[in-house]
Amino acid sequence: MSQTASNAIQPILNLQENCSNFYKKINEKYHEQMNCKQGCARCCFVNLSIFQAEAYRIIVWVLNLDAGKKKELLELLQKPMQSEEKNFQNKLASPCVFLRDNSCTIYEARPTICRTQGVPLQFKQVDKENNINITVDHCPLNFSDQDNFPNKNEWLDLDRLNTLQSIAENFFLKNQQKQDSQIQLAVDKNQRISLTSLKKEVIKILEKEE
């Protein structure tokens, strides 16, 4: 794997680190109002597709695991998936393909969206009169005490995050080398990668290294 390939994912690495730091800051201040903790996977019962840069970042992380960790990850991913459960919207849903025993098997390399779950997310909405309004959303398990809700400057701007994600993705697509890519077959018509497809690619890589 070339140095160019590593440089291509640097923007997404930086963005994900910033998201994790933002979450940590909010969680430290409002930990009594947040139910996010190891073992809670209510937000993990979703079917996601992610940017190619995010998927490639996961591939790079997998390749850099030591032999013991690779074997452990392969065994986990080959286990049967968890059963359907109610997600944070109280709807019955299938779990993420990387979830095992309510724990994320790729936690260190998890996608950006997974790093922002739990914190207040602000985004713009257009009403019937074409007025732009700022809306804030959060996990219904968190911040039940509205009198102690985070201040507006502590909300994560989802629109800005999406813009930064797109910039990181464009940088990746411009700078990656095709011969380095191990996930081309997983790209869908929208140029995104489903986690289901990515899991298959990860298993192939791990099986080749056994």
Give the positions of each predicted feature.
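Short loop/turn segments that flank or connect secondary-structure elements
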Residues: 1-42, 46, 50-210
